[in-house]
Amino acid sequence: MDPVLLPTLFDVLDLLASKAGPVTLDDLNVARRVTSRRFAEIGRVLEGFQVAERKDFSLVPSVNFQQFVECWEVAGVARLDCINAFFRHYRPYDNFLCFLETQKHIEVPPRQDSEARHNLGAELKEKVGLTFVAVDTFKWWGMAVAQVYLSHIGDRNIHWGGARPDIGAFENSLLRHYAQVKPLDGFANIAQLADRVCRELNIAFVRFESLFEQLCFQEPRRYVTATSLARLPTSKSPVQTILPRSKAKQIADNLRLGKPVEWTEKRLMEDGVFVGRRNVKMVRILLEVTNEQQ
């Protein structure tokens, strides 16, 4: 297993898309310093994705590469699903997702419990041939492409998040948990709702956001959203998703800091979701909508 971090992989993918010729270690070192051994590991992973080939100590695009670049620019969650399809050609990552889908979640012991973490690593090695370090890397890969949900509100486990429920099943789950969180003045915290719904339906947070936005647009009178300065005080749940290539590069150009491009968007679940361009943290769901409200 070659646990390569996403920023490094996407630096190389960007170089492959930008250069007319092969990408070498010297090319990559302009943006991010890596060793020759790490460059070889990157090559093995990208060959696994079926988007690049190793040739004379360099990397060249495969016949599938242009399709990957097109995936990279697709809007919404469809972009993540498309990229994940390439990721899954890489056997160790696919083994991780298959195991997670079967188990539904992986219980991760706290850092101070070294014995329990060692035992988990031994179990993972035996069952799926992966080290603890590999799983710790792949959980971020999976989150970035809407296949993993990392809970920091309900628990701290790695949850399968690759399910694709229809809008009806999503709404039923949302309504059930809305009734259970006992909202103040009718307004429930969206992060708390998301944690419950994501764990029940086995969906990633970004898919929750997409389906929630869809409901808000379909039934704007029923789903009343609000902004709030309040954040859940006891949790800090990171969310990251792969940005479209053009958007990531535009953000980097606007900042002009001379730093590597940030290929993923990073935020906190507690900061709510976007409905259109509006960031909302609270929702009130009207169980009955009168003709006047419609």
Q: Where are these predicted regions, by residue range?
A:
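Donor-sugar nucleotide-binding helix/loop cap in glycosyltransferases
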Residues: 1-216
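Long, low-complexity, charge-rich intrinsically disordered regions
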Residues: 189-192, 210-213, 219-294
